[in-house]
């Protein structure tokens, strides 16, 4: 029996394939978040102010994100080009701006550092998923071969 295929983003895909890609994106996201939180709280424990700590921790997370999402989540086979890297950086700069703003706002509203960081992370992850899925790696999704 063959799997039901749907036409999505210019090609036919199985629901299993879509769930697998989303699962991989989420797995990479968890890894990015652990790196982000680990670096952030390590730096703040060393008395680095929370805003510079955010810049450093977020940067560590985006480097991890690019490598894993490109090679594992979206299975990009073509050589990385400047356009893709610039798009990735633009999305991450925008997401970083959102996390920075949310962290600042929640901290200045009296929320705990953990609640502030969680809220900022959720906002940044939403921006990141949408941008990477549609704009950065979107063309690659049309070329993924069934891995069944």
UniProtKB/Swiss-Prot annotation:
Gene Ontology BP terms: polysaccharide biosynthetic process
Chief location of this protein within or outside the cell: membrane
Domain of life per record: Bacteria
Family in the record: Belongs to the GtrA family.
PANTHER family: PROPHAGE BACTOPRENOL-LINKED GLUCOSE TRANSLOCASE HOMOLOG
Keyword field: Cell membrane, Membrane, Transmembrane, Transmembrane helix
The keyword rRNA processing is annotated on this UniProt entry: no
Name under which the protein is recorded: Uncharacterized membrane protein YngA
Chain ranges passing through the membrane: 25-45, 85-105, 118-138
Keyword Transmembrane helix: yes
Membrane topology classification: Multi-pass membrane protein
One GO cellular component term: plasma membrane
Location in the cell: Cell membrane
């Amino acid at each position: 029996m063959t799997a039901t295929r749907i036409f999505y983003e210019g090609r036919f895909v199985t629901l299993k394939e879509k769930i697998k890609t989303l699962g991989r994106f989420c797995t990479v996201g968890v890894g990015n978040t652990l790196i982000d939180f680990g670096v952030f709280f390590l730096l703040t424990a060393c008395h680095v102010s929370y805003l510079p700590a955010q810049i450093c921790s977020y940067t560590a997370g985006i480097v991890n994100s690019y490598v894993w999402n490109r090679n594992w989540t979206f299975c990009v086979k073509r050589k990385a080009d400047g356009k893709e890297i610039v798009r990735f950086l633009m999305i991450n700069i925008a997401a970083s701006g959102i996390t920075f703003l949310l962290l600042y706002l929640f901290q200045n509203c009296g929320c705990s550092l953990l609640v502030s960081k969680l809220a900022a992370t959720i906002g940044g992850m939403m921006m990141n998923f949408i941008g990477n899925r549609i704009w950065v790696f979107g063309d690659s999704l049309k070329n993924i071969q069934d891995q069944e």
